[in-house]
């Protein structure tokens, strides 16, 4: 009985050693198989990377980019260096000088225009031109305010001097509209050696209203002669009658 037990124990130990050696063999075989699979799955680097082809592609891209840049430069694109503070100040000063020069030219041109428009300008300096411009503007403004907007229904005639100017008179009259009216007015002024420098005429419903600015009146005596000459025209007399009456009026004044 003891002998059988000993045999069984020794057989068990042999089986255990055999099992352990088999396990190690299987493990080694598994590792070998894994390594073989890894070697089969890996490819040489040369298959994935071709240095010659890569360098050629990069070279083409580089030269193509350079050609594009040269085209941009040839079309007007340029790279400029940032300007220094001194250069920036010089550029700003030049721009300011050019703008100031243009402004002075524009002002001088406007003064030259005013010198040709103002009727009673004596001095040509800028201060005198500005003063005369203000005075003449106020004079014209007052003239416009005194002119009626519509012709009167009654014949009337009004004359006065313009702002103490003894040579310039303002004449405003209303009368019935008729053919040749303004020609008769011109002949009446010519008879007393006066000349209209500005005229504003309005005709509404068969009535005419006229505002004249007349030069050559020569004081109160000339104003009286002009009023007598124009009054005959406003009242509807013919130009010949107006001329004859005006001559008679002149003789009457001389006799007085």
Swiss-Prot record:
Domain bHLH, chain residue ranges per copy: 91-140
Keyword Transcription: yes
Entry keyword DNA-binding: yes
Broad class of the protein's primary localization: nucleus
CC per GO annotation: nucleus
Pfam families with a match to the protein in the record: HLH
Compartment(s): Nucleus
InterPro entries to which the protein is assigned, alphabetical: AIG1-like (IPR045847), bHLH_dom (IPR011598), HLH_DNA-bd_sf (IPR036638)
Record keywords: DNA-binding, Nucleus, Transcription, Transcription regulation
Subunit field text: Homodimer.
Protein name from the UniProt record: Transcription factor bHLH131
Species name: Arabidopsis thaliana
Organism ancestry: Eukaryota, Viridiplantae, Streptophyta, Embryophyta, Tracheophyta
Recorded name of the encoding gene: BHLH131
């Amino acid at each position: 009985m003891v002998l059988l037990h000993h045999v069984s124990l020794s057989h068990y130990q042999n089986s255990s050693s055999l099992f352990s050696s088999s396990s190690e063999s299987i493990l080694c075989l598994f590792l070998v198989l894994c390594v073989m699979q890894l070697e089969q799955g890996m490819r040489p680097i040369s298959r994935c990377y071709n240095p010659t082809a890569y360098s050629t592609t990069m070279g083409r891209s580089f030269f193509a980019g350079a050609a594009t840049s040269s085209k941009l430069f040839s079309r007007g694109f340029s790279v400029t260096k940032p300007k220094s503070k001194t250069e920036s100040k010089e550029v700003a000063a030049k721009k300011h000088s050019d703008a100031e020069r243009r402004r002075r030219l524009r002002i001088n041109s406007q003064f030259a225009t005013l010198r040709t428009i103002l009727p009673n300008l004596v001095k040509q300096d800028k201060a005198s031109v500005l003063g005369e411009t203000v005075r003449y503007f106020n004079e014209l403004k007052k003239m416009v305010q005194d002119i009626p907007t519509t012709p009167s229904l009654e014949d009337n005639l009004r004359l006065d001097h313009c702002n103490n100017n003894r040579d310039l008179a303002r004449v405003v009259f209303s009368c019935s509209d008729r053919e040749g009216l303004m020609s008769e007015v011109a002949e009446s002024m010519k008879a007393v050696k006066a000349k209209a420098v500005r005229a504003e005429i309005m005709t509404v419903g068969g009535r005419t209203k006229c505002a004249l600015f007349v030069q050559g009146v020569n004081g109160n005596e000339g104003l009286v002669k002009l009023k007598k000459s124009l009054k005959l025209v406003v009242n509807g007399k013919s130009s010949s009658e107006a001329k004859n009456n005006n001559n008679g009026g002149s003789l009457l004044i001389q006799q007085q």
